[in-house]
């Protein structure tokens, strides 16, 4: 896809007016039943706009959080199921993409085979990968089995990926990064608050129960647990926190392969990369050197049997969702219930659809686009994106805290955005992937194929800017700093985000803010450190950067002050980038909305002005119900603010919202103008 060329404001306004006029007037897009008018707009705009929706959509046992994204995902799941079952009902040529989709889905749905015959497959997997119950192991196990298991998707003591070199963005670079943590991040291992202690105790219960279910005695299962928690805690203490990982400069450390072997001699790098299928490594990026040094120490100091137990656990944990029902139930009891508060697992068909989507996402996406994504939706979305680019450029131009020199570079970066809408221009080739009748074998084959594809397409090769990092059916969007691209998959281009039947007040308030959000990521605390080519490079003047940091500190402090549960505050540092993107998305989209309707103002509908409908549409994107366990988990690990605070924490800093609803200092949400965040 070529870069969209920016048109003049008048031309864009005419285009926008044309798409909102015609023989049939467009609707407001606002469902009044979603509102709860027992609240005043300035009391809690979130409850005012979405309280009715929350009452009408109580949490079911399957969900720990249910909101607009989930409504759309449910609809997508039904559409994907229809596509998959349609393919499965056909006669498909062996080796065809259709056969692979059908076979993977059938293997996931075959509960009889999963429950009666899983053990042979699991035993074959474990023995093939070197786990021997006799404990007859050698040092070769560490050298050879470790990377083989990683090839099949079993997490190792560290991670490896091939992606763009952040300081030479046209070329790919091997990246080595911290890993080995079943719980995902260090806080769960090092924090001592009662909630974290509860999670660790539930983790112990899960490890022991799953190991016993697979035939280990209670004594052996507890020994496995002791080895797992000891070694994972060692790795956690040497790892960086989620907030520390947000600093791109601090996590960039490129060295030659020779230097890698010299500085980290405790790992047999030659054997590791050969077993992965990567010979000829020239350079690597060590994101978190301290964590890799701790891996060396663990390999040197821990008994081989203990290391083997860790890998056994990682393999069992990975496999537990793809074998018998009891293993899956134990997995869900921990990840679903203990960590998130869910009371009931997803039905088998949803899990099966998710597996097909994860393994054959673009193949399924091609069918999805052909059936469910009209060309006119792509065209209108591209016009909206172009309008938002103009508006962001206008906002950059009027910022008094930026020098003209920095503004010029920022505008150049904005003009260089690579815009992707709907679906990729080229599709993945799955011809070398083999799918059979065993669910676990299929998942292992898919994992290995993904790694081989990464090596084949990226190792010692330039970056392919046409690669998509989400499938077309994904209900999400992204900005990628190393390619300076914004991407909006077809899956999100549906109500309540995008509605071809609704007017511009709705679409700018919903999908328009999403567009502006992703664009602003190019200028948030992280994205602003990358230039228009995607290179990590300081392009700001020192004075401008200092003024920028002062402004974002206001946002950080405001969100730190938010109490999401009694005694639990939001983490304004972890959520800083997303909060900046929400704020920028609102500011930019509202300006684009004003530009688009300047020549043809929209009417009042259902008693709401166009400006009011803009903010109501925005709030409805974030309506949700959520369990306390899920809130605690997200505050610890999610860089996004909770839905309520993406509304009530953002709108008090938007002057246009005050004007639209007549908010005054008597309203609880009122923030004095001098204290409001003003960045873009």
Positions of PLM-derived features:
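Noncatalytic, helix-rich "gating/capping" subdomain that lines the substrate-entry/channel surface
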Residues: 86-383, 387
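Active-site-surrounding "flap" and adjacent substrate/cofactor-binding loops of secreted or lumenal enzymes
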Residues: 40-43, 48-113
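Intrinsically disordered, low-complexity linker/terminal regions across diverse proteins
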Residues: 5, 73, 228, 263-266, ...
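Sec-dependent signal peptide recognition
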Residues: 2-9
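Bacterial Sec signal peptide processing site at the extreme N-terminus
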Residues: 20-29
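C-terminal motif of bacterial Sec signal peptides marking the signal peptidase cleavage site
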Residues: 15-18
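Short secondary-structure subsegments characteristic of cysteine-rich extracellular domains
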Residues: 62-84, 219-238, 507-513, 606, ...
